[in-house]
């Protein structure tokens, strides 16, 4: 996709990352646990400081965030959130395809989980070749095999 770029997040991106997650994900969290702003901010800060985040940019504009963790046997997409006004434009598809392509070069599958109530995300990942491999009370685990 022309103009699409990932850049490593810095501590200065933490608030953007939180606000992006909130804009894209709050409605789903509310349906399961309710949205406690203080608790969500605490969880975000913990994850943001312990995972490698990237800021997704389109033509120089920050439009989303993504956190990828490479394990010995797979690559995990821990988070991917696109601001609502940029959803449906192929940005998430391009980002996920890049992760899948990069993982394929090292013969690794790609795994993730989505909230069960987020049917849109589940359908999105299925369209990109992900299969359900398990579930918990709240999440569906998915994998894009080699």
Language-model features, listed with the residues they occupy:
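A short beta-loop-alpha structural element at the N-terminal edge
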Residues: 4-19
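Conserved GNAT-fold acetyl-CoA-binding loop/helix
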Residues: 25-45
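Conserved active-site tyrosine of GNAT-family acetyltransferases
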Residues: 44, 125, 130
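A short helix-loop-beta-strand connector motif used in the catalytic cores of GNAT acetyltransferases and
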Residues: 45-55, 64
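Conserved beta-strand in the GNAT
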Residues: 61-69, 76-81
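Conserved acetyl-CoA-binding loop-helix of GNAT-fold acetyltransferases
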Residues: 82, 88-101, 123, 127
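Conserved GNAT acetyl-CoA-binding A-motif
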Residues: 103-115
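Conserved beta-strand-loop-alpha-helix junction that forms the acyl-donor binding cleft
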Residues: 112-122, 138-146
């Amino acid at each position: 996709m022309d103009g699409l770029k990932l850049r490593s997040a810095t501590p200065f991106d933490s608030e953007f990352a939180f606000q992006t997650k909130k804009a894209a994900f709050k409605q789903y969290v509310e349906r399961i646990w309710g949205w406690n702003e203080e608790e969500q901010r605490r969880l975000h800060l913990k994850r943001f400081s312990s995972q490698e985040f990237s800021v997704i940019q389109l033509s120089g504009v920050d439009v989303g965030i993504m956190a990828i963790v490479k394990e010995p046997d797979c690559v995990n997409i821990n988070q991917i959130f696109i601001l609502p006004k940029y959803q449906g434009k192929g940005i998430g598809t391009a980002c996920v395809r890049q992760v899948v392509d990069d993982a394929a070069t090292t013969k690794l599958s790609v795994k993730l989980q989505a909230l069960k109530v987020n049917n849109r995300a589940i359908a999105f990942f299925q369209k990109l070749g992900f299969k359900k491999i398990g579930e918990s009370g709240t999440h569906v685990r998915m994998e894009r095999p080699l």
